[in-house]
Amino acid sequence: MQLSLRLSAIAGLVTRGNRLVDVGCDHGYLPVSLYLDGKIPGAIAMDVRKGPLSRAQEHISQYGLDAYIETRLSDGLEALKPGEGDTLVIAGMGGPLMERILTDGAEVRESFREMILQPQSDIPHFRRFVRKIGWQITEEEMVLEDGKFYPMNIGRAHV
């Protein structure tokens, strides 16, 4: 499966062997690609909208991965329990929305080993928020795709 440059960069930041949670999964390409590459043992792909989640489920089924990648209709982290994943990916959303997701899902957020975050707006404020909640940005990437820069951060708690 060929990922966009942005999604390839995100995939490269995921720690091998971690169970992935992809919030705002859209088409589900990221967890499918990571599983097919043998980088993750499984994933939970979540989206707030039925249409994108349905497309994700179609792609998951197309590759025969229903036993490894689960889909959930969810507003942020609300359909997730603590400990269900190791790596959280939230990408392609505005910083304020990502902040709301991480604030509303604080209990679940604290159960992750790492968060890969790719805010589309309000980046300086979002970086301060990540530090404020006790996470440290330990790695950063920047990708230029279709004339737009996409910053990506890896956050780890208690570093």
Where are these regions (language model features)?
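Conserved alpha-helix/loop element of class I SAM-dependent methyltransferases that forms part
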Residues: Q2-G17
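Conserved class I S-adenosyl-L-methionine
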Residues: G17-D26
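Conserved SAM-binding motif I beta-strand of class I
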Residues: G42-D47
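S-adenosyl-L-methionine
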Residues: S54-G83
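Conserved small/polar residues in nucleotide/adenosyl-binding loops
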Residues: A157-V159
